Amino acid sequence: MNSAEVNVNPRVFGDSFVTFSGNGSGKFEMIDQAEAFLMELDSVAADTGSDGNGNVDLGSRVSNSETEPRFCEMKREIRDSDHRFYELCNESGEKKMEKRRVPDYKSFLSEFDDYVAREKMGSRNSKALSYGFEVGDMVWGKVKSHPWWPGQIFNEAFASPSVRRVKKMGYVLVAFFGDNSYGWFDPAELIPFEPHVKEKSQQTSSDHFAKAVEEAMNEVGRRSALGLTCKCRNQYNFRPINAQGYFAVDVPDYEVQAIYSSKQIQKARDSFSSVQTLAFVKRCALAPQECDTDSLKSFQKKVAVCAFRRAVFEEFDETYEQAFRARSVYCLMKTHEPLNRAPLRVPLSGSLVSAETLGNPKSYTKAMNVKDSTKQDKYLPKRREEAGDMTVQFGQVQESSQFQGINGSSAWDRLLQRRTPCLQTPRKHEQTGLVSMNFTSSSGNIPGKKSSVSKLSRDDDKGLAQESDVRMGEKATLFPDQEKFEPMKSLKQDETGTNSRSNKSSLKLFSGGKFSAGVGIKKGNVVKRSSGEMKSENCPPEPKKKKKEYVSELNRDTPDKRKALSSGEAWAKKSSQVDSAKRRSNMLIVKLDGLQLLSNLLALSLDPLFGSSDRSSFRVIRQFFFHFRSHVYQKSLATSPSATKLSKSAKTLCRANEQSKAGRNRISSDSQQDVPSTKKLKKTIQFKPLASDKKTNQDATKRSSLAPLNPVRDQCRVPINAKPAIVQQEKKTGPSAMVVEPTMLVMMFPPGESLPSIDLLKARFGRFGQLDQSAIRVSWKSSICRVGFLYKLDAQTALRYVSGSKSLFGNVNVTYFLRDMKASSASGDHELKKAKRPKTDKPITKPLNQLLEQAPPVHQPNIQLKSCLKKPGNNRNGNHRTVRVKFMLGEKETESPFSVSILPLSSQDSEPKPVNNQVDHVEPPLDPSQLKVDISLQMMELLTRCNDAVANVTGLLGYVPYHSL
């Protein structure tokens, strides 16, 4: 409705007009006119009264009958006007309320928009504030498939649009250390950094995690030094940036361009307490070892003390250098030098990670710790880095190990390392003056010595082992108790090259009393010998060995020793120059340490929960005794290496001289005439063990010839020489593990079915073991395939497989069975097959009768074919004839004319009968020679038919399959 004036028809009540208007003033106007109208009604009523006698004056007034209906009508009109008056008043009130409500609603919308804008721009910090977090706080966040990772709550105003695009309502942006990854996390799933740093930093020993924790500790130190950084010496230390209330700060000795808000800077300045700092310095002066703990508070106080000294005292103290006659080194630092340096770490430059949904953080943390500890135990030998890096780490963490002993963790030791000052090298002289007990204080901190902190932290040269040995000697004079825990440190690093060699002498002193190398060092084993050798323990000492004897003994020694001598040759030369008194002192220290570890082991056996509060001590004890057991007891259970070597040579000798195996190998090779190189290769392989056996026998004769020259040594070595002889006899009599026993797998296909090719047979059966390539046959006439295996076990495995698989060659009913590849069984099978088939009976009897007529004495030894073929003699002439034998596989019927032409060969072979040995070895090839006649005839016919077939199909599009020929 519009606000224009609404006029109602005016009515005349007496002499007055009543006008209703729609505006606000119409209300009062109507009230005044209504009062005037009522007063007029009263006067009318008074005028229409009677006189004193009760008579009504009708002359000048209207009669009573006329005035009453008029009076009722006027009352009705008044009632209607009042009703309309209230309606108009209500309408005007609603209009006014509407006018008032519109600006109120608009103001409410503006307030809501402001609230939403504040929520988007930074009011999500209100949710973080409810959990006690602010922008810039350091936290631990749980990333999927990762342990709790250190990070800090990052201001999203500094993030790129791609990072802000994936933000979630009510979540905070967390930038992680190490890999510079980031993610949006619910504040309820974050935990503060400082209260949980001791627990969370020991989750795993991964290099990436250790790097992240190290960067987090670096940030903690920088924030501690931030409160003592000012613009007195460098006016560019605090530079405002585009974001309001934030500054780019360059803290000395730390990376440049660290972004902090004014609130963080003020908080860092307020956290510095001069009283507490002075008390900490006094406590360190009175009890340095008690003060030098690995807690986070102690680390922050040390950084604050160093920052206070840097802020108060001169930056370059010339008097200090003059007093100690040190060379003056000035850094040519300009006032604008920090502007030229770039920050080493770029936040949010990594990948986006997603948070892991946590049900119960406390129980989950406990489970994570148990899981990670077991995983760390499982992969403990594999978690070390290169040898050069481990040498640096060993030198840096040595002094912190004397306070935490075996309770320390490698990740915690690494994260507390103080990084080298960048571009401000003279300040390291100032720090060594007051605080000498730093977490990674090295020999460079000693006054008068050259500082080597930066060299230790950055030098990756492998030749650093000798330098670390010198530093260890220097530290032993300052901290005598420190060497007690050095063997345990070496145990943690025994997988690396340099550290395992550096501590090998101390470990072997404790295990067997043997040094690694050196002049005049005892060579014989003490603990690793068997029980038979221990009886000759009291024999007189050995004289100095000659060069040949020393080399032969090294060859008889274990492979592990040879490997250790070859790998640690350079280190042995360096260790030979160490003083003998220092070796004896190290031996005493190692023995004391061993007693302590032994007591811990006894306590652990009595109380299984011993060391449950500190898993690292339990790991060190267990690892030490594992290595001790492997060095002392493990190799004494097995046979001596010399016996093993001689037994292997005995196996080779038996395999070379066994007659039946050699005979079988020669009989089963069918294609040696066609491939002479294969025959030569087999000959060289067969006679190689003979040469090695000859060499072994020559060494044995040399040692036996040297026996009169060294009676004392032979007397001590009697058990060693006796045991290999016994083992060798046993090895000769007993069967070898893998004896070459050629076995043939025969597959009989139904007639008319397609047969697999030789390549297919090799591919199908090559997986089961080594095949005899020359024994693989495919016979199309008889529908038989043969596959030869060198070992019977492989053939049996293949038979089990093909018997269980019905679809190896399709849906074909194939019969499988094994056959021994012996000449007797092969010839017997051929004769049986020929006897079964009536077509081949006559061709077989004719050549046999002819042989009986021409050479009757030769038929008698034919009964002994089995025994002769099993044990052929050493005569090579017979072997050559055996090589040229071929079997008949096609089983084609034979004809006598061709066999008659070959009969002179058999008569010539039967000529040297007077010599019994030659006759025995020449007789067996007679029967295969007859088979050779049959094969030649069949091959001639086959070649003739092939020639005709090829001539017939020349120029045609197709060809006839081979089996139809």
UniProtKB/Swiss-Prot annotation:
Top-level taxon in the UniProt lineage: Eukaryota
BP terms from Gene Ontology: regulation of DNA-templated transcription
Residues of the PWWP domain: 135-196
SMART domains, per database record: PWWP
Subcellular location as annotated: Nucleus
UniProt entry keywords in alphabetical sequence: Nucleus, Transcription, Transcription regulation
Intervals of motif Nuclear localization signal: 546-553
Disruption phenotype: No visible flowering phenotype.
Gene3D superfamilies reported for this sequence: 2.30.30.140
Bias type Polar residues, positions: 437-455, 496-507, 657-676, 905-919
Gene Ontology CC terms: ESC/E(Z) complex
CDD domains the UniProt entry points to: PWWP
Pfam families for this protein: PWWP
Family (UniProt): Belongs to the PDP family.
Assembly and binders: Component of the PRC2 (polycomb repressive complex 2) complex which regulates histone methylation on histone H3K27.
Functional description taken from the UniProt entry: May influence gene expression by regulating the function of the PRC2 complex and modulating H3K27me3 level.
Record protein name field: PWWP domain-containing protein 4
